[in-house]
């Protein structure tokens, strides 16, 4: 029994629930008493009377059993409640001597250093922006900072001692003009504990929302605190930065950046906060999302992902760009997304770029559509690790009468590798309803040994009047050995997008990247295929991309094959696209000193 744990508050709530169940059953039994125990015979004959008497007897027997069960239930609830009270009394009796003992332990350090040895810090009073009371030197969590009065910054959260979590920062006060900043989160315990969250920024009624408070840093072990959200206003306030994770932490990442504040009536949403760094060995925190834009306001940019640990760790993902919504005439522009964080020095992958914000169209006829935000750039890899992928471009919406469409955002470029690792893939271009879709992002450069990243596909043009996005170029394998990245495919649209060129191979060894295929054209020509990449000294040239087909116009031209250098075959040319007149096939690439020329593509 020495290992039995009881929570008196939970037991009391359970006893109350049991009593309510008994009351509900008692009310139901009382309601059924008359209809089930006093049945009238269906007729004046003996059989009907016997049947009614039989069922009434069953009802009376049920009521007798129910009365016995109700009595047992009441006794059980009474015993259960008494047990909960006994546990609570025992806990209170045991706690009283411990409180006295704790006072004895804390008194010397309180007198000498002004801080207790064990205990949580006191919270700051609301509406004062107060800093918090001191917590225990050995063990205890920092107190929460007090919220600010109108126009006053929130109080900082308290720092923990050796063991404990930092306190949350107080909320910034609202202002008639600009909102006040939120308080910073307190630092985590020196040995173990997470940083406190930053406080949210205050509302800026006619100006800019308050800045979100930065998250607190951890000590040796623990997660970084989350950055506070930016306050809403004409321009949204920026989100606070995430706190750094513990110096020797491996599992927990840096704190995420705070979300940018909302913007209204033509302003700009707040930028998301930067993710916290990853100490020595952990991952960086994600960047905060950009703030939402309302009534013609642009969405805020996403925050940059935090860098990975100094030695090892992946970069944090970039924050998503904020959505921009239109007013009666002008569509809102989506915010650009944040770049991915860089990896650590030795091992780790670069962070993925965030997604661009969506641009929503104007609600009135004749208005313009909203422009999507640009995708974020992927973070750079470590000495041993790949670059991060680029983010997807934001969606471009149309207006209410479908006349003026918004432009899709371009995909972000892939991050570069350093020593050994592949470049990150380029992000996909954003789609558009009636405007130009976004182009795909360029693939990242490979390391000294590593392949180039693939180019991102062009965005799709959804309706008539749209233009498909061009595919992104494949990344080069810029070092000694590695294949070039494949080019991204062109996007579908009334007018199609061209495919991206393949990346070039490394100096000594590797094949060139294949060119991307051209997109499908609905009313215009099919997109042209991308050119194949050049091979290294030993390797084949990349094949050209196929030309895109067209429903009513000419097929796209096939891309030419890439050339070989010393030993290897030239790449084959891409086939021409199908259409009212077929597209011309691409030329084959030139062979090296040893090898065959590439075949031309079919027309």
From Swiss-Prot:
Pfam families: PE (PF00934), PGRS (PF21526). This is Uncharacterized PE-PGRS family protein PE_PGRS24. Keywords: Repeat. Coiled coil: none annotated. The keyword Metal-binding does not apply. Residues 1-93 form the PE domain. It comes from Mycobacterium tuberculosis (strain CDC 1551 / Oshkosh). Residues 309-333 are annotated as: Disordered. Belongs to the mycobacterial PE family. PGRS subfamily. It comes from the Bacteria.
């Amino acid at each position: 029994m020495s290992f039995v744990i009881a929570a008196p508050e939970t037991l009391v709530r359970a006893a109350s629930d049991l009593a309510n169940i008994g009351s509900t059953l008692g009310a139901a039994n009382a309601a059924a008493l008359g209809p089930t125990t006093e049945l009238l015979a269906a007729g004046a004959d003996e059989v009907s009377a016997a049947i009614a008497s039989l069922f009434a007897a069953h009802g009376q027997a049920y009521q007798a059993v129910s009365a016995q069960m109700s009595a047992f239930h009441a006794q059980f609830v009474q015993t259960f409640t008494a047990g909960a009270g006994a546990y609570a009394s025992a806990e209170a009796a045991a706690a009283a001597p411990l409180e006295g003992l704790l006072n004895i332990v804390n008194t010397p350090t309180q007198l000498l250093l002004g801080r207790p040895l064990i205990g949580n810090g006191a919270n700051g009073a609301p509406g004062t922006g107060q800093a918090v009371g001191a917590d225990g030197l050995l063990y205890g969590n920092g107190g929460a900072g007090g919220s600010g009065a109108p126009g006053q910054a929130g109080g900082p959260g308290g720092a923990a001692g050796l063991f404990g979590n930092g306190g949350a920062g107080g909320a910034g006060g609202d202002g008639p003009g600009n909102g006040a900043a939120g308080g910073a989160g307190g630092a985590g315990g020196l040995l173990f504990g997470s940083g406190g969250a930053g406080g949210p920024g205050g509302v800026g009624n006619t100006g800019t929302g308050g800045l979100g408070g930065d998250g607190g840093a951890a000590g040796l072990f623990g997660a970084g605190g989350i950055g506070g959200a930016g306050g809403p206003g004409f321009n949204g306030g920026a989100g606070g930065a995430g706190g750094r994770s513990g110096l020797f932490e491996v599992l927990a990442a840096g704190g995420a950046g705070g979300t940018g504040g909302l913007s209204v009536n033509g302003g700009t949403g707040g930028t998301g906060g930067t993710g916290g760094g990853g100490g020595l060995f952990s991952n960086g925190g994600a960047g905060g999302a950009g703030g939402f834009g309302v009534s013609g306001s642009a969405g805020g940019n996403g925050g940059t992902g935090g860098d990975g640990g100094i030695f090892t760790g992946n970069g944090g993902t970039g924050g998503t760009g904020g959505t921009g919504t239109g007013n009666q005439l002008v569509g809102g522009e989506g915010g650009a997304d944040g770049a991915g964080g860089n990896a650590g020095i030795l091992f780790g992958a670069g962070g993925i770029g965030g997604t661009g914000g969506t641009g929503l169209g104007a609600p009135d006829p004749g208005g313009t559509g909203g422009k999507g935000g640009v995708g974020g750039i992927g973070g750079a890899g470590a000495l041993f690790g790949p670059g991060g992928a680029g983010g997807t471009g934001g969606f471009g919406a149309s207006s209410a009468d479908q006349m003026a469409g918004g432009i899709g955002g371009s995909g972000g470029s892939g991050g570069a590798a350093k020593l050994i690792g592949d470049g990150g893939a380029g992000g996909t271009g954003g789609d558009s309803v009636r405007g130009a879709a976004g182009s795909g992002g360029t693939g990242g450069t490979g390391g000294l040994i590593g392949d180039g990243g693939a180019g991102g596909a062009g965005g799709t043009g959804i309706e008539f009047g749209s233009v498909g996005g061009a595919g992104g170029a494949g990344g080069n394998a810029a070092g000694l050995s590695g294949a070039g990245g494949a080019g991204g495919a062109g996007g579908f649209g009334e007018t199609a997008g061209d495919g991206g060129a393949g990346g070039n191979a490394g100096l000594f060894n590797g094949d060139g990247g294949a060119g991307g295929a051209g997109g499908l054209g609905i009313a215009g020509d099919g997109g042209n295929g991308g050119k194949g990449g050049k091979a290294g000294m030993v390797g084949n040239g990349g094949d050209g991309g196929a030309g895109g087909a067209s429903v009513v116009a000419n097929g796209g031209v096939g891309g030419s094959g890439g050339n070989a250098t010393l030993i290897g075959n030239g790449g084959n040319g891409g086939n021409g696209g199908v259409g009212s007149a077929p597209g011309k096939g691409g030329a084959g690439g030139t062979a090296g000193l040893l090898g065959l020329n590439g075949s031309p593509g079919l027309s």
